[in-house]
From Swiss-Prot:
It comes from the Eukaryota. This is Putative flavin-containing monooxygenase FMO GS-OX-like 10. Its EC number is 1.8.-.-. InterPro entries: FAD/NAD-bd_sf (IPR036188), Flavin_mOase (IPR000960), Flavin_mOase-like (IPR020946), FMO-like (IPR050346). It comes from Arabidopsis thaliana.
Amino acid sequence: MVPAVNPPTTSHHVAVIGAGAAGLVAARELRREGHSVVVFERGNQIGGVWAYTPNVEPDPLSIDPTRPVIHSSLYSSLRTIIPRECMGFTDFPFSTGPENKSRDPRRHPGHIEVLAYLKDFARKFKMDEMIRFETEVVRAEPAAENPKKWRVESRNSGDISDEIYDAVVVCNGHYTEPRHALIPGIDSCPGKQIHSHNYRIPDQFKDQLNSGSSVSGVDISRDIVNVTKEVHISSRSTKPETYEKLSGYDNLWLHSNIETVREDGSVVFKNGKTVYADTIMHCTGYKYYFPFLDTKGEVTVEDNRVGPLYKHVFPPALSPGLSFIGLPWQVILFPMFELQSKWVAAVLAGRFYSKLEASCIPKRYTHLMAELDSQFVYDNWLADQCDYPRIEKWREQMFYKVFKRIQSQSSTYKDDWDDDHLIAEAYEDFVKFPSNYPSSLIEREYTS
């Protein structure tokens, strides 16, 4: 997908909130359209959630609203669920090369490699000159003197800045503010409780129970299983009678949903089984959270639905001055970020603008692309709006293949695959682009 040269368009002064993958590609696409861009990043480096830290929050459940917030939810051994070939931006392949000896060459690399890729991307497109590091947006709202413009208040080392922008693009991610399941009796549990947001390494666990059976929840369970006596996974998506030992492990069980937690530390499942847990880890996902955003009620978050939004991006009453990148989940994230960003940049420039409509989709799963096909319908719609090539067929098929492998070989899918023909197709496309890795690699140690 070689990007086209865009004709002269209207230029705007745009604030991008967040310098993770979404914020980086949004800034690039906005600048390509001729906009003036400032990226606000509260951390001291790019990467967003991919910037790993061993630090955790003092409140292990992350409930206390006054707690110091740790942005990243990565654990030390995390590897990508999606293969690198289909994970990268369309014109900046997440490939490997023989010259990159210190890099992680695995198809499902660790988080260090993803951050290195994003740093390469930022270096390639000279992103640092647009980013204000250690600068937190504390308030963004329509300007009182001109509601079509946006007032952005930011803080850096105690200094407050107040600026006016033509538009705000929200790219702050949604893997920082934990969600918690409503479990009867959970408040009386005498054992330790932790949300997976604060999980880093397995050494601290003994008898462990995980509430939540998403792919990441199961991966964490496998990370813990070798250092703990037993791990029991609770899943609300299984049948009530579910009770099975997971293949390849003698101490890892899958249960149905939790019925109740008792004061003696016992946990009763819907299947009738009872276990005693030293620790309950809540692998229950995250909330959409925009504490800095004041839209005077035009955009709300209710039951984990951000709305009303047109195509997950523009709130009709505030478009095109306010937009969101990256809300859908269970998708191939980076290419979707890229296509959404192209659309936002083009709409702000006065190209491809279509009338925005309020969404009437049921709330909780508004941003879930539950049907595997739905994300590609959406991505291709975005591509069509921008006169950009549609998502490659090999990328679609690779995504389908990995989800089949997750279901059939969940413990080995990251290291055992049968889609070499798709890898070959991907690398045939990748040769259209210059190497995405600079000659001098990022200076850091990589431990596989």
